[in-house]
């Protein structure tokens, strides 16, 4: 290129750079890689077919970027390759929205994955592609795909690279360059550059940062020489690896896929084959039913997967087998080559007959005539204290529908109680002249039901007509939900005390079931009933000292600190059974990462479509770490002016305890105050409340305070945050949504914008919106509608009067404020903020759910859930030994001592405000989670610390709600379940772990190891956490003290990778500090007792 390049050429290169960055952060990193590998232009029609699950706006946004890159490819423009990040930098888990691409971790490259569909004919080779025969026989040593899919991968890449038979226009035109270009097509993932982005969407560059872009302007000959040299090195490496793995790779047959007979495994005797009902395939040739020709293809394509590459020593931080890696590899294998179901034929008549016969047996063995009677004093929403069962004996041609609780029949009906010695009572009635049969419905939740007498026995309905009473029954049923809600809310408010779950019994030595209740709206077990009280509180008072709420002071890790228990708020906003899995706080870290990328794609498509061309720039996506800004020190502050992230690092919750107590006080006692949040409080009293929050280290008592003072103090808290609740980067985006996006599109736009918020901001927003929705529910008393609340709170939440623009100087802002007259832009923003907050209050239940479009997304979103494995699955992780979970535990112990022997080599120190050492280590396998390690010195012997960890968790875990041993496996291994509280109204966190401990270790050390496990006897008591790795190592260090080392890698659900990098390590450090303080306070109390 000549030096006097036109300005249009430079702008085009900038657009290409921004397009590649956008593709990476929105879930299309494979196209950015193809452009950097000089494999553009791509076929836009093929891209549309590949992403046909996306809507039209998202496809248009994607195609705009790809067309830009196609134009740059035609103009022979290049951009600097994506720079590989250092090992210490934060980076997202690589993921693509399309399920037809896979990321190879060994080479850190993307390769196309063409799924082989057995029900459709094989696609013909792409016409016009050069060297097609040679490409068919070529193999790629770096690909994890089977030989069957390699041909499809190469063909698809050729179709993406060019639609004609010639070499792409931006490649070298000489004959010598043909071989390197072909080699780059054969091995799609040949480069070692890592395709990733920063730990959030904010890595998009600003157009003004022209100095950070580098353009390739070298001569034609120099580019050819460099390309040939690079390709020669890759070709040599490819040939060397092909020679070592020649026996494992064969060219695919041109005659199609040939499926052999099942191969008998070693150790499979005749008895085992008989037990598995294995038969010869030849015997089934004449015993099949007639199906369409397209369905006669076998769905059991058995293909051997290529051997996985060996993991490096740094890939697993503790050198233990990873359940996540094994599960992901198996699921990926099945997705690529199909699944072989041994002994199963979906089109076999015998299989259908067996299923029908088994269903018939189940129906015959089901006791259809059994009825359970509910006592009269039964309270809705709770489990009955006593149940008695009887039977229904319809006579004649009557039938009973047990699913709906109704029965039909013209004949006589007899109802009897099995435990009753009285004669059965006959229920007779005449047939209706208008129908051949009549129907009676029985409701067990209707007070004063016509089927019960005052004594509790079934009423005699022999001479009574049923139909006139149906209107009364339906009337009671319609009003039943309202009555239950009022009764439950009243009881919850009365019994919602700070010490509702303070007394937690020590962990029992024998397994017991966790006493959990079933909520009337969500039929899943919960650790709390509808009244907000624990169902497993001890009948006798325990000797555990009472813990009091303490706000957020300077010292935040004392063992007697108590969390706010706001169970009525949690139960009133508990999601229904159908929407539980759709809640954001139930998604894994990998799902959250993918969901964030899709949200950015959706938001980009909507803003580019509806906002003016000069307003939809990514001003909120400025690259991070452009310059190091000194973080202010918040040690002198406790509540007001402290960022939400600092609150999480201090206490584990984004809102201070005193602010949560203020919201609870308003919700329980002040919802009937007219003009709540609208009428102003007294400034002197508000200032006194602020000082009380800042200075109080214990409970902040709001009893007797004016509702308007507390409400004004709450508004000032959000106003004094260092940045708006919607963040500085996204506040303008929220306002643009309600200024330009049509009303019918605003809900999905605002849901996408919420997904881009930091985790702590999103959690606080959800808590606040749910709280405000409860305020509007009492609109008849307080006259505060969503719009009225939005007018009062929008300036505080969006910081409208003090919102700093990126390009606004302090002088301009000061002059703007001195004028005292808002311009039209400010008026529009205030109106948009008011409309937006009112809309979010009204639709708060829909804002924090996974979009429905994700269910249509053809990727591994459901596979990214990464549920814990069962004991049997853990035993199969080590293929070198027989299946036994004990081998897995022993590997974990060996890996722990390997780290100790190597003196924790490779760990990176991390600063923390806690009095403990904190460090982390990156793990390449599994989800994008770091392994954190925290070390502290504890004034106790190793045996005492181990006992406290095993049996006395309630003494140091302030969030503990309940704990039980589910099953004892041996003297040192058990299945343990415990539930931890979360900030209301977010659900509790449920842990089910396999834990084992060792006491006979060298030098008197002890160890405790935990890993999440799936157990059928552990009821779901909240959001099920996946603990990938948790280790406690206790080593004596003399003078009655011990060194406690805690390592943890867990997926708490509902958090982005960025949250784990910034906050989770501080929580690990705070945990060991609380364990140490539990011994320190115990020693202090014992000294005080002796002095007395």
From Swiss-Prot:
Main location (coarse class) = cytoplasm
Q: Which GO terms describe its molecular function?
A: GTPase activator activity; lipid binding
Q: Does the keyword Coiled coil apply?
A: no
What superkingdom heads the lineage? Answer: Eukaryota
Could you tell me which residues carry Phosphoserine?
A: 86, 89, 129, 322
Q: Name one Pfam family in it.
A: RhoGAP
* Topology with respect to the bilayer: Peripheral membrane protein
What are the start and end residues of every segment in region (Polybasic cluster (PBR))? 615-637
Residues forming the Rho-GAP domain are: 642-848
Residue(s) at site: Arginine finger: 678
Q: What segment(s) does the record annotate as region Disordered? A: 121-179, 297-330, 409-434, 492-553
Ranges of compositional bias, category Low complexity = 154-174, 299-325
Membrane: is it a keyword of this entry?
yes
Query: What are the record's GO terms for cellular component?
Result: cytoplasm; focal adhesion; membrane
Where in this chain does the record put each START domain?
878-1085
Composition bias (Basic and acidic residues) maps to 415-426, 514-526
Q: What processes does the entry annotate via GO biological process terms?
A: actin cytoskeleton organization; focal adhesion assembly; forebrain development; heart morphogenesis; hindbrain morphogenesis; negative regulation of cell population proliferation; neural tube closure; signal transduction
| Keywords, sorted A to Z | Cell junction, Cytoplasm, GTPase activation, Membrane, Phosphoprotein, Tumor suppressor
**Subcellular localization, as worded in the UniProt entry:** Cytoplasm; Cell junction, Focal adhesion; Membrane
Q: In which tissues is it expressed?
A: Widely expressed with the highest levels in heart, liver and lung.
Domain remark in the UniProt entry = The SAM domain mediates interaction with EF1A1, and functions as an autoinhibitory regulator of RhoGAP Activity. The polybasic cluster is required for activation and mediates binding to phosphatidylinositol-4,5-bisphosphate (PI(4,5)P(2)) containing membranes.
- Subunit text: Interacts with EF1A1, facilitates EF1A1 distribution to the membrane periphery and ruffles upon growth factor stimulation and suppresses cell migration. Interacts with tensin TNS1 (via N-terminus); the interaction is decreased by phosphorylation of TNS1. Interacts with TNS3 and PTEN; in resting cells, interacts with TNS3 (via C2 tensin-type domain) but, following growth factor stimulation, TNS3 and PTEN are phosphorylated which leads to weakened interaction with TNS3 and enhanced interaction with PTEN.
Q: What is this protein called?
A: Rho GTPase-activating protein 7
Q: Give the organism the record lists.
A: Mus musculus
